């Protein structure tokens, strides 16, 4: 289905394109996989569908667990930790990084929230290697190296 020109710019939001799609296609569950995330697997997709189909979640998206590392702003200020009380890594709960590569949602949730996720949200945890999102030349080189190593 062609998108209207206003949804085809460098600044168009994916959520707006998904809402446009939902107005023209009948579906219960939408799977949105970004082309820039080539390592998302059918297992990840199926897990997300099952999470939403079971009605335990209204939507779900792919994440990777990341252990705590000290983060700094460009102004050289610690982000979310106290420089005078640096925690030990093993004492800090891990965080989950949104992959940007896979989203599963119901039509109702999408149309109500106007967002790809909302309501009761679930995480589809994927290994770091499948969480690569190609947004730079370095990301592309990394993806090519991974493909070369498994070919």
Kindly give the residue locations of the regions a language model identified.
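Short, well-ordered alpha-helices that flank and scaffold nucleotide-derived cofactor binding pockets
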Residues: 23, 50, 145-149
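Conserved core of the sugar-phosphate nucleotidyltransferase
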Residues: 10-20, 38-127
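Short acidic donor-binding/metal-coordinating loop in glycosyltransferase active sites
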Residues: 4-5, 35-37
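Hydrophobic helical membrane-anchoring modules
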Residues: 124-125, 130-151
């Amino acid at each position: 289905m062609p998108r209207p020109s206003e949804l085809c710019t460098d600044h168009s939001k994916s959520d707006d394109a998904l809402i446009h799609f939902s107005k023209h296609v009948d579906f219960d569950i939408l799977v949105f996989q970004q082309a820039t995330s080539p390592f998302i697997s059918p297992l990840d997709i199926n897990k997300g569908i099952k999470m939403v189909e079971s009605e335990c979640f209204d939507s779900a998206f792919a994440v990777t667990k990341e252990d705590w590392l000290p983060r700094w702003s460009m102004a050289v200020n610690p982000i979310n930790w106290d420089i005078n009380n640096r925690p030990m890594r093993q004492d800090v709960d891990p965080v989950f990084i949104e992959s940007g590569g896979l989203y599963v949602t119901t039509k109702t949730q999408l149309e109500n929230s106007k967002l790809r996720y909302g309501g009761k949200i679930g995480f589809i945890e994927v290994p770091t290697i499948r969480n690569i999102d190609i947004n730079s030349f370095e990301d592309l080189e990394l993806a090519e190296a991974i493909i070369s190593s498994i070919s």
